[in-house]
Amino acid sequence: SAQDESVTNVFVAPGNAGTALEPKVTNLSLDTNNFVKVENFCKEKHVELVIIGPEQPLVDGMSDYLQSKGINTFGPSQAAAQLEGSKTFSKDFFIKYGIPTAAYASFNDFDSSKNYLDTIEYPTVVKADGLAAGKGVIICGNKDEALAALDSIFKDQAFGEAGNRVV
């Protein structure tokens, strides 16, 4: 941690007002989706450990990339990050390995998902399959609410590409 005497600098990208107040911490305007820029920064500043927090770089494989370049990294591999990156992948994984999970179905289009609503009990949960910054879950008390959720996800693109499939 930054409190350890052996730590001289902690770089945070992008950081925030709170991290800026911490001793030894420097906020960066570094594009964390550009793996080569992150790699170059780490090598230039002799960074000893990268802790990856945001979901998107993990799902995109930043941990694997940096490790392949000899940079110590704390974060799941790209394959493991798929558990967070795709609700369908997670559900399939749980079923394959006998991990208890709620019943589900996934759909790539509005009409198929709409037809499914007649076969389920309420309340139910409608989720955007992909990364939606923690906002892709809608709890629906009845069919009308579920239809509105599907409309928002598929037709209004409320969650962008994360909503190309729903669970």
Where do the model's predicted regions map?
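Short coil/turn connectors at secondary-structure junctions
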Residues: 6-8, 46-47, 69-70, 99-101, ...
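Conserved ATP-binding module of the ATP-grasp superfamily
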Residues: 100-102, 119, 123-125, 141-167
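Catalytic-core regions of core metabolic enzymes
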Residues: 67-68, 79-80, 112-113, 145, ...
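Short acidic-hydrophobic, aromatic-tinged amphipathic segments that line or gate anion-handling sites
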Residues: 26-33, 105-109, 140
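ATP-binding N-terminal substructure of ATP-dependent carboxylate-amine bond-forming enzymes
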Residues: 1-79
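A general structural signal for well-ordered alpha-helical segments in protein cores
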Residues: 35-38, 59-63, 87-91, 113, ...
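A conserved helix-loop-beta module that forms one wall/lid of the active-site cleft
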Residues: 74-136
